[in-house]
Amino acid sequence: MEAVILFPAIDLKNGQCVRLEQGDMARATVFNLNPAAQAQSFAEQGFEYLHVVDLDGAFAGKPVNAQAVEAMLKTIKIPVQLGGGIRDLATVEAWLEKGITRVIIGTAAVRDPDLVKAAAKKFPGRVAVGLDARDGKVAVEGWAETSQVTALEIAQRFEDAGVAAIIFTDIARDGLLKGLNLDATIALADSISIPVIASGGLASIDDVKAMLTPRAKKLAGAIAGRALYDGRLDPAAALTLIRNARAA
């Protein structure tokens, strides 16, 4: 089957590695004071691609935790995709030059779709769109505001733009270990040609198994956060499952 990727997540707040519940900055749990050490740990566990979000940046509209991100890039060799506060072409370019493999544009994808198109054209394969939905509608500004458009409506705007992936997050499940919203994610993946990555709520090896079933064949991967930090998801078991599925 196609190469499905399990991305371990590092969310940055005040230079620390945290997990939020439903995107609420007041409900942040610090899991590691040293994000670079956490990144190194994930790389050593065998993960092949890291997912990083600058939470402060998402709220500020510009990069805030650049120092922590740069420390990670110096520490690990695996590719990193980064979101949070990326709202203009200059920021996209700056991060890619610093060694980020793929940037994720969220709020600006809703507010300024031309930015995504310009960035994807200039940097083919290196621009992803982050669509975070609450009750089907896309939320912006670090999830502080909910728009009136659906994830599918926005995703369709980028069908021919050369976007590398869409990261679809179900806010209601994020950080709560309730399981991925595979129904909504698969429905989105089946409606567009852009690869879709599932995010929000991954709770156990069962989610990884579900992601590898025939009905989820269009999914490009999933993001694991709290389940890894809480020890509910064994990295070795999850990665072995994925490797075996690839070989099948």
From Swiss-Prot:
- Keyword annotations: Amino-acid biosynthesis, Cytoplasm, Histidine biosynthesis, Isomerase
Record's HAMAP family? Answer: HisA
Q: Return the protein name.
A: 1-(5-phosphoribosyl)-5-[(5-phosphoribosylamino)methylideneamino] imidazole-4-carboxamide isomerase
Compartments (UniProt record): Cytoplasm
Highest taxon of the source? Bacteria
Primary place of residence? cytoplasm
Write the Enzyme Commission number(s) for this entry: 5.3.1.16
Pfam families (UniProt xref):
His_biosynth
- Residue numbers annotated as active site: D11 (proton acceptor), D132 (proton donor)
List the catalysed reactions: 1-(5-phospho-beta-D-ribosyl)-5-[(5-phospho-beta-D-ribosylamino)methylideneamino]imidazole-4-carboxamide = 5-[(5-phospho-1-deoxy-D-ribulos-1-ylimino)methylamino]-1-(5-phospho-beta-D-ribosyl)imidazole-4-carboxamide
Organism expressing this protein natively? Bradyrhizobium diazoefficiens (strain JCM 10833 / BCRC 13528 / IAM 13628 / NBRC 14792 / USDA 110)
Q: Name one GO molecular function term.
A: 1-(5-phosphoribosyl)-5-[(5-phosphoribosylamino)methylideneamino]imidazole-4-carboxamide isomerase activity
Q: Listed GO cellular component terms?
A: cytoplasm
Q: What does the similarity note say?
A: Belongs to the HisA/HisF family.
GO biological process terms held by the UniProt record: L-histidine biosynthetic process
Q: In which pathway does it act?
A: Amino-acid biosynthesis; L-histidine biosynthesis; L-histidine from 5-phospho-alpha-D-ribose 1-diphosphate: step 4/9
Q: Does the keyword Isomerase apply?
A: yes
The top EC class is: isomerase
